[in-house]
Regions:
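Gly/Pro/Ser/Thr-rich low-complexity, intrinsically disordered segments predominantly at protein N-termini
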Residues: 1-199
């Protein structure tokens, strides 16, 4: 049976099928350039990350599951997505993913990685993780066809929104994130960070 340890020693390139067949471990891995790369090591998520993830998930889930939502769908945490990066299979695992039922109908959802391009992914910075590295990941998401990427920085108490056709914009304090692409959704950074208990 394949294991992460054996693969790291052999430097064997993984196919998406081999990667998805690996046994689950305590560490979350992503498939990057044929290698199983730890998502957070050595910067394990801490309390702020753990607090922010369910709060942001709940905001997105409440919005996209409301009867009046123009783009009904579902929000997910830690759901692998089948993408392409630099012409190679790429399987990232965003902290949060929102996908509409138009892109992935309910009846097409199975206990498998996300096979459609979601509208939004959210990544929360962990201690020791460089903002630059996450910005590059945001660019990779956009290049793969995901139209919106949010990078949440607990230290700066900011949310930076990345767009495919405009420069990124950072929101702090009472600056509300409102986007015609996600109609009806309103996120105020200071409210999110206050709810998470981040001073």
């Amino acid at each position: 049976m394949l294991s992460i340890e054996k693969l790291s020693i052999s430097h064997q390139k993984l196919t998406p099928e081999q990667f998805l067949a690996l046994p689950e471990e305590d560490i979350t891995y992503e498939l990057v350039d044929g290698q199983a790369i730890p998502k957070h090591e050595p910067m394990s998520p801490k309390r702020f990350h753990a607090r922010l993830q369910p709060i942001l998930w709940r905001i997105l889930e409440d919005w996209c599951s409301a009867a009046e939502c123009p783009k009904p769908g579902s929000a997910h945490t830690e759901w692998a997505i089948l993408l392409t990066r630099q012409a190679q299979p790429w399987i990232p695992i965003p902290d949060i993913t929102y996908i509409s039922h138009e892109r992935l109908p309910i009846e097409a959802m199975a206990d498998e990685p996300c096979s459609a391009i979601p509208e939004l992914v959210v990544e929360i910075l962990s201690p020791g993780q460089s903002f630059g590295a996450v910005v590059q990941k945001a660019a990779d998401y956009l290049e793969a066809g995901i139209p919106r990427v949010w990078i949440v920085d607990p230290q700066a108490k900011s949310i930076t929104v990345f767009y495919p056709d405009a420069p990124p914009k950072t929101f702090t304090g009472s600056q509300a994130i409102q986007d015609d692409f996600l109609p009806g959704l309103k996120v105020v950074p200071q409210d999110v960070f206050a709810q998470a208990g981040i001073p």
